[in-house]
Amino acid sequence: MPAVQRAFAGFTNSLEESAFPAFENRSNLRYTPEDELHDLICVGFGPASLAIAVAIHDALDGTDPSLAEIPGLESRTPKVAFLEKQPQFAWHAGMLLPGAKMQITFMKDMATMRNPRSEFTFINYLHQKNRLVEFANLNTFLPARVEYEDYMRWCASWFEEVVSYSQEVIAVNPQKSANGEISVFEVVSKNLLTGQVETRRTKNVVIAAGGKPNITAPFPQNHPKVVHSSKFSYISKQILKDHQAPYKVAVVGNGQSAAEIFDFLHANYPNSQTRLLIKGGALRPSDDSPLYALHLLLPSSDYGLHSAVSMKSSTHRVPR
């Protein structure tokens, strides 16, 4: 049973705050019973939804002036829930290869560019984990991907009270009011552990379910030796057990994941015949120029986030 269900089994409105179980890190958001009207439900709890949760926490905490005037936050804590299909928080867990580093600076974490005073900055994470001095001595802005995933897990742990894991959303149904306008949404989810179907009502919905692995034709969809990059670190241990064996491996694609897998195979399987198959004539570096980065940080890019927290009846799809 997920942590939230265990923590709040038998929950009633008569419970006092002191009756709540203690969380090691606890955000400013509070659990909302399923039968109450929510202000916001996020479908999926990856980096996009986590960033929304952090922004709402900072707004309630008063540490982020840019969110201080969002309607509704000054009078009460919003009723928010996050529904996640996975049994726990995970970010590209199948791609956490040894030695793989982030491609962007840690400054672009869950909070720093928006609110450097937030508890959820990568710097504060390092401080809390007694890793600040060690990381500073690395003389880099690019943390290991494994450490950055642990940072996001640490951030996610603050919101256990409002996240329901093992919940697969199967429908989002708009509900019209008497005048014909959409006033609320009905979010239907299935508990993957019990099979129970649950329904919640909300004024706003954010769809942040992430992408689905796609193995394109002509490759077979369910062949044991045709592996999508999102599952590589799991399955490679099963089908590439001998690091000295003369395997023949083809890596198809020209993105960052393909390049990292190719490099990993070349370094760890010296006798393997590994080929990188790409459509173009050469690999292209990612666009990390200052101009491109500035475009991503323009205020207009925050439209989805600000609209989601402003308590207007709406639905948004954001990348994950």
Task: Describe the role of every protein-language-model region.
Residues 166-170, 192, 231-232:
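Conserved SAM/SAH-binding loop
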Residues 101-134:
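Flavin (FAD/FMN) cofactor-binding and adjacent substrate-gating region
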Residues 64-69, 76-77, 90, 95-96, ...:
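Dinucleotide-binding/catalytic capping subdomain of oxidoreductase cores
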Residues 31-81, 249-271:
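N-terminal Rossmann-like FAD-binding beta1-loop-alpha1 element of flavoenzymes
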Residues 134-154, 164, 313-320:
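Short beta-strand to alpha-helix junction loop
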Residues 12-28, 198, 204-274:
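Glycine-rich dinucleotide-binding loop and its adjacent helix/turn
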Residues 165-185:
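A conserved short coil-to-beta-strand element within the FAD-binding core of flavoproteins
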Residues 129-143, 184-188, 246-248:
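Helix-loop-beta segment of a Rossmann-like dinucleotide-binding subdomain
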